[in-house]
Regions:
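Long, contiguous binding/interaction regions
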Residues: 1-20, 24-59, 70-197
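Amphipathic, charged alpha-helical scaffolds that flank and support histidine-based chemistry
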Residues: 64-67
Length: 197
């Protein structure tokens, strides 16, 4: 039986672009490995990966960002949909989702003694905030897109060395009016076994 969410390949799908996959799964150990192996076999690098719980108990959401051709990524999505503990895999382009990432920047506290210019850049221009100030370092937090967090990184680099930098994986929700629980109930009706929802 075919699951919902299977995609067809068109001739126009050969250009490399950024795609976001949202994969709903049962909360089972070992599934991360099963999913990442599919990308490895097709030589597709995962740019960002986030796994979290959903609003439905026992269901996890994998948010995976890749740069690939649509042709290749459709094959990956179709393969992921065939995994036993996968409830549904969905493919999105950037304009089809709401998404955010978080970035943390560790800077020497000394650069803040040079005046308020850096604080104006951080707070006013980039909407970042100072998370923690210690004697030897200061932590800045920025939530936004990868482009936005990278622009702040480049700007901060001009003031001195960035001691440490970390960026989270993307979290994303579809712009479509689909509720996870409704999708799972529809899926449950087509399956012989009951889902624990």
């Amino acid at each position: 039986m075919k699951k919902k969410g299977l995609y067809q390949i068109k001739d126009s799908d050969k250009k490399v672009k950024e795609y976001t996959l949202s994969v709903l799964t049962e909360d089972k150990a070992g599934l991360l490995n099963s999913i990442t192996i599919i990308f490895n076999r097709r030589k597709i690098n995962i740019d960002s990966l986030n796994v979290s719980t959903t609003e439905v108990k026992g269901v996890s959401r994998f948010t995976i960002v890749v740069s690939s051709t649509k042709e290749k990524i459709i094959k990956v999505v179709n393969h992921i949909n065939k995994l036993i503990d996968v409830l549904g895999a969905f493919l999105y382009e950037e304009d089809e989702i709401y998404y955010q990432e978080i970035a943390l920047y560790k800077l020497s506290t000394k650069i803040f003694l040079k005046g308020d210019l850096i604080e104006k850049i951080i707070i006013r221009k980039y909407g970042a905030k100072i998370l923690k100030i210690e004697k030897d370092h200061t932590i800045i937090q920025k939530t936004g897109t990868k482009v936005g967090t990278q622009k702040l990184y480049d700007e901060l680099k001009k003031f001195g060395e960035i001691l440490e930098f970390a960026r989270s994986g993307r979290v994303a929700l579809s712009k479509k009016k689909r509720k996870t629980i409704n999708f799972l109930r529809t899926l449950e009706k087509t399956k012989s076994n009951k889902l624990n929802i």
